[in-house]
Amino acid sequence: MSLKHFIQITKPGIIFGNVLSVAGGFFLASKGNIDFGVFLAAVIGTSLVVASGCVFNNCIDRDIDQRMERTRNRVLVQGLVSLKLALLYATLLGIAGVALLYTEANPLAALFAVIGFVIYVGFYSLYLKRRSVHGTLVGSLSGAMPPVIGYCAVSNSFDFAALTLLVMFSLWQMPHSYAIAIFRFNDYRAAKIPVLPVQRGILVTKRHILLYILAFLVATLMLTVGGYAGLNYLAVAAGMGMYWLYMAWKGYKAVDDTVWARKLFVFSIFTITALSVMMSVDFQVTKELLVTYAF
């Protein structure tokens, strides 16, 4: 047991991805008027809650992880950290994260962190992941919470922009997750996890991927339509979304589904990263703020 093991069970890669989306939502709402104290609270608080959820997920999935090639060497599967200690660690991380968001950001940001945690750990990890093909859809809601937390940490309100972020990031999660399920098909089948490719076949999954990316593309444009993001954001969102849609369409002619799914997965990360960056720098400033800056 070492510090490295405690870091590994928090899934740092997932935390880093969520930090980018928190920042995107935060800077979108800030419109150039940045409170760095609140920003750090939003980023650190959300990271702690996400880390807590990941540790709980590792605890819950020990039996599944033993059957999957890519997860059989995880810390808890190997017994490098005890289950009791991991549960305590996860609990402390979660409490610290929610407390930080509540006290240094606002109660609304903390509420969305709790909602995301409950969906991920309670509904997805404990139940739906093992029992329903719709587990991915429900789990996608938890993955969409970080940008909403970042946005609400500034705005302290759930408005059209916050709703758009929730819908947009939820829709993004679906083809992203389905791509993983395709190139990790044998692992999911061995672990008896009822993901869409295993339950209904890869061809059906390709159709779902195409439809979700199309819906995602439309949702991303709503930030500009609603007057929250600028034309540069719109251009990047449209360009990335259409190319991702084109890649999904090419899947119908793919010779090797595993290779195609990996490419789709990698591009999904580029897409959401680009949009998080663009909404951070190309926000729409209201007329009232422009007058304030002018004087």
UniProtKB/Swiss-Prot annotation:
Keywords: Cell inner membrane, Cell membrane, Heme biosynthesis, Membrane, Transferase, Transmembrane, Transmembrane helix
Coiled coil: none
One Gene Ontology cellular component: plasma membrane
Cell compartment(s), UniProt: Cell inner membrane
Residue stretches spanning the membrane: 9-29, 36-56, 80-100, 108-128, 135-155, 163-183, 209-229, 230-250, 265-285
A GO term for molecular function: protoheme IX farnesyltransferase activity
Record EC number: 2.5.1.141
Entry membrane topology: Multi-pass membrane protein
Superkingdom of origin: Bacteria
Enzyme class: transferase
Reaction equation(s) it catalyzes: heme b + (2E,6E)-farnesyl diphosphate + H2O = Fe(II)-heme o + diphosphate
Pathway assigned to this chain's UniProt record: Porphyrin-containing compound metabolism; heme O biosynthesis; heme O from protoheme: step 1/1
GO BP term, pick one: heme O biosynthetic process
InterPro entries xref list: Protohaem_IX_farnesylTrfase, UbiA_prenyltransferase, UbiA_prenylTrfase_CS, UbiA_sf
Miscellaneous comment text of the record: Carbon 2 of the heme B porphyrin ring is defined according to the Fischer nomenclature.
NCBIfam families referenced in this protein's UniProt entry, alphabetically: cyoE_ctaB, PRK04375.1-1
The family this protein is said to belong to: Belongs to the UbiA prenyltransferase family. Protoheme IX farnesyltransferase subfamily.
Function: Converts heme B (protoheme IX) to heme O by substitution of the vinyl group on carbon 2 of heme B porphyrin ring with a hydroxyethyl farnesyl side group.
Protein name from the UniProt record: Protoheme IX farnesyltransferase
Gene name as annotated: cyoE
